[in-house]
Amino acid sequence: MRSKTRITINSQTPFIRFKLGYFELVEKYGKLSDPMNLDDLHRGVDYELSPGGVTSMIYPLLNELVKENKIEIPYWISLGPNAPYNVKTGNLNLINISLNEKDLPLYTNFKEGLWRELHLQGPMDINPDEYEAFTKYNWYCAKKLFQVLPQTDLYFVHDFQQIQIGNLIGPSAPTIFRWHIPFKLDNISPLVRNFILKNVSCFDAVVVSTRRDLEGLVRAGYHGKAFQLYPYTDINKWKKPSRGKTDAFLSRLKIKKSDKVITIVARIDAIKSQDLAIAALSQIRHKFPSAKLLLLGNGSFTGSRKGGLAHPKSKQWKDKLLSYAKELKVEKQVIMPGYIKDEDLATAYSISDVIVVPSRIEGFNLTTIEAWIHRKPVIVSTGAGSSELVVENMNGYVFDPNNHSELGEKIELLLKHPEAAIKMGEQGYLTALQSDINRAVKTVTAIFDETLQAR
């Protein structure tokens, strides 16, 4: 048996999102190497790291596995519209898949419909052309996976967009499917339910984020190998911001040091339910007239026009939030600066009095862990998977996402009692230690080994 496992990752969202297309890069730099070396480009100008929980978990995990000599430098195959085909960066070999101009929006519509139904937002319309584009995308990924098969011992496939990969790959190599969104098939259409269950059953093993989702997997009739692993983060990557950075951040967002700051870190998407926090803010605004609601984040890979899928849902939701804030007369208290870098995100956590995770339904949400790393109290919707880690009145609060008044009451409690909030944040930090990447490395390595040995 090899001392190092050869891993190939497959996800829809790429680790790198290019702001310039391949031909724009050629025009700017002349001849590019093949594979293209990311060190030859400029971060923030030519490319950026894709935001989101999936990519922020995968990359640190791969780095740690390489450092510990558990795996060889892996391949990562993902969807990269107009991106260079082969990219080399650090411990990664990136391969980008493209869809043509006709198929890309069709693929996007199908996977968005599937996403909405799986998040209980209503039944999807099955359009044959959209399904064909979705299947084409999965087949293009499978073809690239076959191409790197001689350098692969194990495929590690991420999230629902890749659901057909296990069926397409078949018995060629062990394949683990990491499902990141809620696995609750009880209230979806039989057609979609069967589609999900049949395809999930084609993988050698499935990993879900929460106990809720593991129970949902079993309840749906899945009989294969299944694991539950809470999402994780690298605790050591977070550094305390300097006073100068903090002052500059406050000044840029026009927040006073005396203001009470309620923060949500999430992409601008209806499923993140920022509207509940706006309603809660209106409920407490007379008691805390200087309170600010800080909504950090912009669109996802799906909504990005540069290097993404250009779906309009992010802009539509942002417009609704701004309109709702105006309707409730709290528009001057709601701050939406868009995407911010990790170093600014650490500053945002540091100035916050409370972190809210209001999602009506969500797979997990790493914001809960990140807030605890910064010793901040959290208020988490019972619809978010991370609520499983919240012990009421110890490391935070939970609330019913159908009751924004409960959210408002719990925000008020924390703002009124800052000493209790500090104690909650300290307890939260102890909880966050359980989600450190070093623990995850051991668990993931064990899952890899068990799956390989079963073959």
Language model: regions and residue ranges:
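Conserved acidic donor-binding segment of nucleotide-sugar-dependent glycosyltransferases
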Residues: E392-N393, Y397-H404, L413-P418
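A short, well-ordered alpha-helix in the C-terminal region of glycosyltransferases
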Residues: E406, L413, A420-Q434, A446
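A short helix/loop element that forms part of the nucleotide-sugar donor recognition site in Leloir-type
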Residues: K239-I255
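Aromatic "clamp/platform" in nucleotide-sugar-dependent glycosyltransferases that forms part
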Residues: R360
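Nucleotide-activated donor-binding/catalytic signature segment of Leloir-type glycosyltransferases, i.e.
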Residues: R305-I340
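Short alpha-helical donor nucleotide-sugar binding micro-motif in glycosyltransferases
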Residues: T347-S352
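Short hydrophobic beta-strand element within catalytic cores of glycosyltransferases
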Residues: T368, P377-V380
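Conserved donor-binding/catalytic core segment of Leloir-type glycosyltransferases
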Residues: K256-K272, I278-L281, L294-L296
